[in-house]
Curated annotation (Swiss-Prot):
Function recorded in the entry: Involved in the degradation of chitin. ChbG is essential for growth on the acetylated chitooligosaccharides chitobiose and chitotriose but is dispensable for growth on cellobiose and chitosan dimer, the deacetylated form of chitobiose. Deacetylation of chitobiose-6-P and chitotriose-6-P is necessary for both the activation of the chb promoter by the regulatory protein ChbR and the hydrolysis of phosphorylated beta-glucosides by the phospho-beta-glucosidase ChbF.
Binding-site residues for Mg(2+), renumbered to this chain: 61, 125
Database matches in InterPro entries: COD_ChbG_bac, Glyco_hydro/deAcase_b/a-brl, YdjC-like
Leader sequence residues: none
Protein name per Swiss-Prot or TrEMBL: Chitooligosaccharide deacetylase
Swiss-Prot/TrEMBL keywords: Carbohydrate metabolism, Chitin degradation, Cytoplasm, Hydrolase, Magnesium, Metal-binding, Polysaccharide degradation
Cellular-component GO terms for this entry: cytoplasm
GO molecular function: chitin disaccharide deacetylase activity; deacetylase activity; metal ion binding
HAMAP family attached to this UniProt entry: COD (MF_01246)
Summary of subunit composition and partner proteins: Homodimer.
Reaction catalyzed: N,N'-diacetylchitobiose + H2O = N-acetyl-beta-D-glucosaminyl-(1->4)-D-glucosamine + acetate; diacetylchitobiose-6'-phosphate + H2O = N'-monoacetylchitobiose-6'-phosphate + acetate
Cofactor(s) demanded: Mg(2+)
Membership in a protein family: Belongs to the YdjC deacetylase family. ChbG subfamily.
Length: 252
């Protein structure tokens, strides 16, 4: 059985080093797709690079934890900035859901304005779209617009709650991250997906070259390691041997 493999590089637009790393992993590696933060410092640079790579699938990386929002969000920001306090607000069930829904629409429009096209799919920075309070908003938004959505099915308690016309891969993995970034880890992800009988799989990654912005990230130098593994000729060959076809969310 032919299986579709989407290797999606998150954080397009975060910095020029991030952008160049993603492009390198696409041109000379196994990355097939990316998602962009429309409030990132290098989003214009990302859009410029993407015009030179029309086959690279570019989706939107919904942001509620970093930088300035596109719209006014007094209920979520502190001193005008987004941050990781969103986790505490989610636990306390005090999220400003109307503001979040409006910000999603505004970021979506900003994406269209910057890239000149709709995103191939949606996901989010730090997986905030998988919060139980936020997921229905984002799932409904994606379904209404006919675009795909990253879904971590391990966190969706009731698959029956998903909109019937929502598109996503059958499998998703965030395991290629952290301390064990190796070719063996990547291939274990593929083999586990194949064992589950999934016809499509998304693997999340964050390849980058280090610059001053990336140095400020708690997840800095592992991005270089990811880039090294993702551009390995042996990894590309091993993926092909397993019957996976590289694709984007337009293939789902």
């Amino acid at each position: 059985m032919e299986r579709v493999l989407i290797v999606n590089a998150d954080d397009f637009g975060l910095s020029k080093g991030q952008n160049y790393g993603i492009v390198e992993a696409y041109r000379n590696g196994v990355v097939t797709s990316t998602t962009a933060l429309v409030n990132g410092e290098a989003i214009g640079h990302a859009a410029q690079l993407s015009r030179e790579l029309p086959a690279l699938g570019v989706g939107m990386h919904f942001v509620l934890t970093l930088g300035k929002p596109v719209s006014e969000m007094p209920g979520l920001t502190r001193d005008g900035l987004l941050g990781k306090w969103i986790w505490q607000m989610a636990e306390e069930d005090t999220l400003p859901l109307d503001e979040i829904a409006h910000e999603l629409a505004c970021q979506y429009q900003r994406f269209i304005d910057v890239f000149g096209r709709e995103p191939t799919h949606l996901d989010s920075h730090h997986h905030v779209h998988m919060f139980p309070q936020i997921f229905p908003i984002v799932a409904r938004f994606a379904a209404q617009r006919g675009i795909a959505l990253r879904i971590d099915r391990q966190t969706v308690l009731n698959a029956d709650d998903l909109p019937s016309d929502l598109r996503s891969t059958q499998g998703f993995s965030s395991e290629f991250y952290g301390e064990e970034i190796t070719e063996a880890c990547f291939l274990r992800i593929l083999d586990a997906s194949a064992h589950r009988g999934e016809a499509s799989l998304e693997v999340m990654c964050h390849p980058a070259f280090v610059d001053n912005i990336i140095r400020q990230s708690a997840y800095c130098y592992p991005r270089l390691t990811e880039l090294e593994v993702l551009t390995s000729a042996s990894l590309k060959a091993a993926i092909a041997e397993r019957g996976y076809r590289p694709g984007s969310f337009l293939d789902i």
